[in-house]
């Protein structure tokens, strides 16, 4: 008898291929996490085509409590939030594991591009073998969940996944990827904040000496290091150097002050022992840099071998030993 497994099935090509691959070795139960938008019918059709029991779980209240409220608060605090890195350990995976425990399933799987590998008898989160690696967004997961996790796409790239979907005759083979924040259709987070009554008021752009350079449209519209869309004419290009929440000011500079080799982070989550120098990634899209971690009771001071441009408060710092994620911590600001 095959072991039971719960799969997060979104209705996209990644989780669809994950379902088809897992069917060979597991009794797969498919779960669609409902946030009140589209996708459920595609997920249902996929589950039915694979004869996989299908469940819809409404996660809107949990998403609001753990993700949306914090997302809005971070922007009003001058930070740039990373909602997926928050949702995975607080909403998505807890919901899937709760369903797994309810039906007696030993394992949980998703279509993320990541791997679970064994190191010294420990299940570890590791990077996928493709450029679409999503281990950064999973770096806040509790270590105790890792032995029960499966990521069947971890050794595939996106084109291989689409090709498998075509070979399998899956109707979502050429379905476009979702590039937006799932709870903000159109990715217009400023409009979403305004609808919630959370938009920050207009204020001044200033230089480091306090000289007014122009007017900004609300601090929530800007992120550290931003150089586009400022609407300020000047003798040279300007970048967001700092967001002063108390004064409702956005400080601009020529960008020379944005690079640093010392980054303070807080609220650490450890997945594997740190045995020496690591590499660190400070944003999902950024490349890694060599670093040394100085760990204390409140967080981590990260010393990088080369300067890092604009490590942004609200973003995650993920730490790697080779391909293995050893931990993560939030960039302080």
Language model feature labels by segment:
Residues 26, 109-116, 121-333:
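AMP-forming adenylation/ATP pyrophosphatase catalytic core
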Residues 1-139, 150, 159-160, 240:
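ATP-dependent adenylation/nucleotidyltransferase module used to activate substrates
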């Amino acid at each position: 008898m095959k072991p039971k497994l719960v799969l997060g099935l979104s209705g996209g090509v990644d989780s669809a291929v994950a379902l088809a691959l897992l069917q060979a070795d597991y009794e797969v139960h498919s779960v669609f996490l409902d946030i009140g938008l589209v996708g459920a019918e595609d997920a249902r059709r996929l589950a039915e085509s694979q004869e996989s029991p299908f469940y819809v779980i409404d996660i809107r209240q949990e998403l609001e409590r753990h993700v949306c409220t914090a997302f809005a608060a971070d922007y009003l605090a001058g930070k740039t939030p990373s909602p997926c890195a928050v949702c995975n350990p607080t909403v998505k995976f807890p919901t899937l594991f709760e369903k797994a425990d309810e039906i007696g399933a030993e394992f949980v799987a998703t279509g993320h591009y990541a791997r679970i590998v064994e190191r010294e008898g420990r299940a570890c989160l590791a990077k996928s073998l493709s450029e679409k690696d999503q281990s950064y967004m999973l770096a806040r997961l509790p270590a105790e969940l890792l032995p029960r996790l499966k990521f069947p796409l971890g050794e595939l790239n996106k084109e291989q996944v689409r090709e498998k979907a075509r070979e399998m005759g899956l109707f979502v083979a050429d379905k476009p990827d979702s590039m937006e924040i799932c709870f903000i259709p159109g990715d217009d987070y400023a409009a979403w904040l305004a609808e919630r009554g959370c938009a920050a008021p207009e204020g001044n752009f200033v230089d480091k000496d306090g000289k007014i350079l122009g007017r900004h449209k609300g601090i929530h519209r800007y992120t550290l290091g931003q150089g586009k869309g400022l609407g300020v004419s000047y003798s040279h290009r300007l970048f967001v150097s700092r967001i002063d929440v108390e004064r409702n000011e956005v400080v601009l500079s020529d960008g020379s002050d944005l690079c640093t080799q010392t980054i303070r982070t807080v609220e650490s989550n450890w997945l594997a022992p740190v045995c020496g120098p690591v590499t660190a990634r400070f944003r999902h899209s950024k490349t890694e840099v060599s670093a040394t971690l100085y760990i204390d009771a409140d967080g981590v001071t990260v010393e990088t071998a080369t300067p890092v441009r604009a490590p942004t408060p609200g973003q995650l710092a993920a730490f790697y030993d080779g391909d293995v994620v050893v931990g993560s911590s939030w960039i302080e600001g």
